């Protein structure tokens, strides 16, 4: 993995950021938040209780402020192999799918318990590629159900259905999934929380003078060349998938931010348009 460093953010507003907080949409937004495995779990695969509690508290507060929150959560496989006492993340498909089946139960139990403390109702949606990219009834059902859940005030929690997904119907990573969801429901903002702080102009592991890029106005070959390898040992994503997600989201008119999930309270600053991580500016939404 390239391009990682401890998260920092300034209290000053970047002149190109914060458009969503100040434009004609008003103070509330439709926000998709993707949480990576490294944010939710310790390296052992066991749940990082302190972090997930704070994460749910902040998302509940943002929802109380009037924002619509959709959570795309990784972590099922990692929590499953931890609970099954496997020594490391499984590599064969049957064990991955078995771990997902066990871990998804623990994941949703935890979310339901924590969000209930703040009087919010959660809903689980486990999907595969045809549910969101197909042109048939599956896609329509997913979209209608998700919109209805938001109308009813629920907090949808989405994950790929790893227990039944095959290569043919797999989306592959939740960076891409979250961007597809954001595009599908015309979200205003997509936030990717992971163990990386954003996009750097060079590898900060090798270059101590590497600088975080606060704003990307356009995804071009130079920006894509900055992407490094794959993600952490617990997850499946990396900077490459995050830039692919940025392409999907921004083309649909949705801004995207990459930030470090080790600091969940940073969600407040991100929603307010403060310069946290790297913000990818969106194209204009179709009318």
Role assignments for model-derived ranges:
Residues 25-287:
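C-terminal catalytic "cap/lid" subdomain
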